[in-house]
Curated annotation (Swiss-Prot):
This is Histone-lysine N-methyltransferase ASHH1. Keywords: Centromere, Chromatin regulator, Chromosome, Flowering, Methyltransferase, Nucleus, S-adenosyl-L-methionine, Transferase. It catalyses: L-lysyl(4)-[histone H3] + 3 S-adenosyl-L-methionine = N(6),N(6),N(6)-trimethyl-L-lysyl(4)-[histone H3] + 3 S-adenosyl-L-homocysteine + 3 H(+). InterPro entries: AWS_dom (IPR006560), Post-SET_dom (IPR003616), SET2_Histone-Lys_MeTrsfase (IPR050777), SET_dom (IPR001214), SET_dom_sf (IPR046341). Residues 84-206 form the SET domain. Residues 36-87 form the AWS domain. GO terms for biological process: DNA repair; flower development; methylation; response to UV-B; vegetative to reproductive phase transition of meristem. It comes from Arabidopsis thaliana (Mouse-ear cress).
Length: 492
């Protein structure tokens, strides 16, 4: 179904995308749930107690698995088919300053409640990375790809549900949870706390950061991490200082992709004060909004501001004027040197800016979960080899050096392969890295450590058995002097 816009509406155009209620499986077939894989709970429905049907104590609910219709003992009374039945909370699409569109609650939402499913195209991680790069090159300003499992992602850029509009917050009131539904993993947005009507929904993206432009976070939380995805491994690897004295990638030098640039009204005034009431009113009157219910999306052509919208706008204005934001905005707007150039989502030619001012992403592999602030001193094997006396010794050290290099390359390429699983595990405590993936990683890490150990023990062994070369006369005299000195000391 095409999500259409009302051409009479004022303000920003509504986004164009295809609205879907279930994940799209064009990339691969939907798995067919085998009968032996269907998990059947032990709930018994009691007509006198409607809560007896698949509630908190249902074995399937406890294991984040939806009951399979036709197999649940509670039959049609089963309450554990929320994804399948699209039992969504009522929400409304609204324009949020600086952050594009967002979703607000239209009703009281209880802590832990299922809000809606994050639907999109199910694609492989390889495809996801490719698409992310293509979108960026084509100037697609918002990112809609999220992790599904170790090997797949959901891309809601072209096809998706309303969940694609939920913005990020470093202090979120929602979270994503993975559920098993009829043999497939599906991602749901759940309330982390009770949410009152008119409150914007937000979860912590903590998403994969693929390199390239970074988006400044405008969530306004006190403990805001500064950038979207700033906690992701990729982002940290790219922005941390890696070598002594090499601060090319330190956080204060990275180019910024600033979503606040999109809307003129979101720019803080020169003196750092918040927008005037007049500006706020203008913002409110030009807002567009959509309302969602469980099974339909209705457009609203009403352009009169409701108290809820005013709240939302006021909230974002406050956000913009917090002390942290003032500092961030001033930095980004005043400094236009190539190193700190603002990468605008609207005006900037992303690929041009990328090639001119973004530092090249280094292929530094994941280093065992630790960011590297202390530079590791590398032994220069070529120099060491020159010191060795025999050809055999040299060959041995060179052979171990080769093995060490291969092990490092293997670990590095493996990291690219399994990074989604590692990050998913770090992000989402309910998931665990598949044993096969963990085993591969441990094996490759051990191989690299062993290769390093073999190399350095070979260096030590061969250096130790290399006779000291005859030295020039000057050195000899100096050493002789030292010997005398030692003897003298001994004599005393
Ligand atoms: C999944 S979309 C969310 C919906 C989006 N606002 C829209 O209009 O379609 C993610 C994008 O929204 C923007 N965004 C979300 N949360 C943000 C935040 N806290 N600060 C700045 N931009 C944000 C970023 O451009 C991000 O790539």
């Amino acid at each position: 179904m095409q999500f259409s816009c009302d051409p009479d509406q004022e303000g920003d155009e509504l986004p164009q995308y295809e609205h879907i209620y279930q994940n799209d499986f064009s990339y691969r077939k939907h798995k067919k749930q085998k009968e032996e894989d269907i998990s059947i709970c032990e709930c018994k429905f009691d007509f006198g107690d409607p809560d007896s049907a698949c509630g908190e104590r249902c074995l399937n609910v406890i294991t984040n698995t939806e009951c399979t219709p036709g197999y649940c003992p509670c039959g049609v009374y089963c309450k554990n088919q929320k994804f399948q039945k699209c039992e969504y909370a009522k929400t409304k699409l609204i324009k949020c300053e600086g952050r594009g569109w967002g979703l607000v609650a239209l009703e009281e939402i209880k802590a832990g409640q299922f809000i809606m499913e994050y639907c999109g195209e199910v694609i492989s991680w390889k495809e996801a990375k490719k698409r992310a790069q293509t979108y960026e090159t084509h100037g697609v300003k918002d990112a809609y790809i999220i992790s599904l499992n170790a090997s797949e992602a959901i891309d809601a850029t072209k096809k998706g549900s309303l969940a694609r509009f939920i913005n990020h917050s470093c202090r979120p009131n929602c979270e994503t949870r993975k559920w098993n539904v009829l043999g497939e993993v599906r991602v749901g947005i759940f309330a982390k706390e009770s949410i009152s009507p008119r409150t914007e929904l937000a979860y912590d993206y903590n998403f994969e950061w693929y390199g390239g432009a970074k988006v400044r976070c405008l969530c306004g939380a006190v403990a805001c991490s500064g950038f979207l995805g700033a906690k992701s491994r990729g982002f940290q690897e790219d922005t941390y200082v890696w070598e002594d004295g090499d601060d090319r990638y330190s956080v204060d030098k990275i180019p910024v992709y600033d979503s606040a640039e999109d809307e003129l009204t979101s720019e803080p005034s020169k003196n750092g004060e918040s927008n005037t009431n007049e500006e706020k009113e203008k913002d409110i009157s030009t807002e567009n909004h959509l309302e969602s219910t469980a099974l339909n999306i209705q457009q609203q052509s009403d352009s009169t501001p409701t108290p809820m919208e005013e709240d939302v706008v006021t909230e974002t204005v406050k956000t913009e004027t917090s002390e942290d934001m003032k500092l961030l905005s001033q930095n980004s707007q005043e400094d236009s040197s190539p190193k700190t150039a603002i990468v605008s989502r609207v005006h900037g030619n992303i690929s041009k800016i990328k090639s001119e001012s973004l530092p090249k992403k280094r292929g530094r592999p994941f280093s065992g979960g630790k960011t590297k602030n202390v530079a590791q001193k590398h032994v220069d094997i070529a120099n060491v080899v020159q010191l060795l006396a025999t050809k055999e010794a040299q060959d041995e050290v060179l052979k171990y050096e080769e093995v060490k290099k291969e092990a490092a390359v293997r670990l590095s390429s493996l990291y690219d392969e399994i990074r989604p699983a590692i990050e998913e595990h770090e992000r989402d405590s309910q998931d665990s890295v598949a044993t096969s993936v963990a085993e591969k990683w441990i094996q490759a890490s051990c191989n690299k450590l062993k290769a390093e150990f073999d190399l350095y023990s070979s260096v030590i062994k061969n250096i130790a058995s290399t006779p000291i070369k005859p030295q020039d006369t000057k050195t000899k005299v100096a050493e002789a002097g030292n010997e005398d000195h030692i003897k003298l000391l001994e004599a005393k």
